[in-house]
Each structure stands twice: as C-alpha cells, then as structure tokens.
C-alpha cells in the first residue's frame, strides 16, 4: 500500500523566483495490488507526488508510507534499500545508449550486487515477460519506441518491486503502441500483483487501465474514487473537462442540428442518461416505457468499458409535455440514473 498522510510540499523561493506550493493537504491511500491513476494538468503536482513516493523529495509536512515504511523519514542506506521496492517507468525511456537491452535491464541488479549467473537468469525472465526475448542484444538505437519502453518496464521490475510508478510512460507513443503497453502493464499487475501508480494527463490511459483514480488540480486532490464512479458522476469542473476529452459530450450531428430550446406540439424532449453495467441501457429504456406507460425513443447511445465496468450514455426522446418530463426525470432520479434535459426535437 502507498499512503499519503497530511502531505504538503513547498519549494522555497530561488534566484528571485517565488516559492511554490506544489502539494497541499494530500490524504489518500493506494490499495496494495491495485492500478491507480493520478491525473492532472501540467503544474497540478503530479511530478512532486512521484518524487515523494520514491523518496527523491521530502514532504514539507506529513508522511508517505510505502509497504508500511515511512519513506519520508528514511535516508542513506535505509532509503536506498527501500527504493529497490519501487520501480520507475519514464516517459522518454532513459536507457543507456551504450548498453544492449539485456545490459540495460541488468544495471539495477549489478548495482544491487547480484551474482552474474543470477543476473543473467533474471534478465532472460524479464525479457520474456515483456515480450522482447529476441531483442536481448539490440541497442536502444535499434529498437522502436514501444520496444524501448518494454526494456524500461523490464528494468523497472528487475529488483522485484512491490510498487511500479509509471510517469507519463505512454505519452511519447502512438495510439496502437500505447494500447499494447497498457495491456502489458495490466498483465504484469495480474501476474505479479505489483501495485501500479499511473501518473498521466490523459484520461484515455486511466479509462483503459486503472481501477481507481485520483484527480489533482493546483496541488489539491479535487476528486477520487473508482474509475466508473468518476466517469458517471464527475463533480469537479477539472474532472468534467478531462471526461469531455475522452468520452465527449457531443451528439451525432444529425441529432444535434435538430435540437431546439423550446418544445413544439407533438415533439419530444431530449434527455441524456448515464448508465452502468452490462445491459443497463436496454433495461432503462424498457423499464421506463413499461412503468410509466410512455413511448421512449433511443436517439443515440455510447457504451464504454471503464474500470472493468460497462459505462454508457443514452440519449432518449420522450413526449415533450412538462408533466411527462417531470415524471421521467423523477423516475430516473429514484433509480439513481444521472440525467439532464438537452432540449427538444420536433
């Protein structure tokens, strides 16, 4: 487990530049064996959070607990030993160009004083795990971006860490390679049980891989919880803006062009509903029509798998009278389906 207790981090004024409150009042826990996304814009405090977890920075106040050890209180040899239980994957790979893939993976084991035979066996095991056993003697210049990141992941796992930090590890990769790397991390989490902390500014990464998410803004945790909960009930504007980028609030052009602000005789009210669970969309439409005795039209729908759950957005057309709209919205609220009226169509 990784736990932040009353954390703040302030960088003092330097060479005429004012001090910076990078993190303030941070209290949350990352469950053992979980995949947790930490998301925020540039300057939100993500990098400071990473540096506190791996002990490269000390908090101004509070404690950082990793595997029941107060990392923030350690120094010297004790800190170096604790850091072996924390692996790190970097955005730009940070491989040594003069070393082969195998030798890059071997480096932390050499530093830790492993025997040569044990290093050779461990490196072979890791190359197979990340799917590049045939690239063991290749230099970084001979590898693709995805292959370089696989070497980086193998190196991060070399000392058998319990926590793996992924700092924008897919930001420099194309979409197809990003999906492959995220699939690899999911497999590593399943096989090894390692706790993965995803530091990212991309909600699409959180959607594909994470089960829990923490949203940072201006050094504060503004929202946290299960990914599916955050996707269906975002409360903070910064979270809503992230979700708009990946899920989108846009309607099909053919529908959006027809929506007006005032009802017309015989027209329909357009209501967007958030649903969760396999088959939930069909259930909502059928139950709404049956229990309220209404004609309900499904105008548009989108379903995603998020945090291991199906999360969807339905756009419904219902009779446009105020009375019917009130009944529909009350029914949806009663059964905890978030909903909003978008307007009317003729």
Curated annotation (Swiss-Prot):
It is an enzyme of class 7 (translocase). Pfam families: ABC_tran, NIL. It catalyses: L-methionine(out) + ATP + H2O = L-methionine(in) + ADP + phosphate + H(+); D-methionine(out) + ATP + H2O = D-methionine(in) + ADP + phosphate + H(+). Coiled coil: none annotated. It comes from the Bacteria. Its EC number is 7.4.2.11. Residues 2-243 form the ABC transporter domain. Keywords: Amino-acid transport, ATP-binding, Cell inner membrane, Cell membrane, Membrane, Nucleotide-binding, Translocase, Transport. It is found in: Cell inner membrane. Its main location: membrane. It is a peripheral membrane protein. GO terms for cellular component: plasma membrane. The complex is composed of two ATP-binding proteins (MetN), two transmembrane proteins (MetI) and a solute-binding protein (MetQ). Part of the ABC transporter complex MetNIQ involved in methionine import. Responsible for energy coupling to the transport system. This is Methionine import ATP-binding protein MetN.
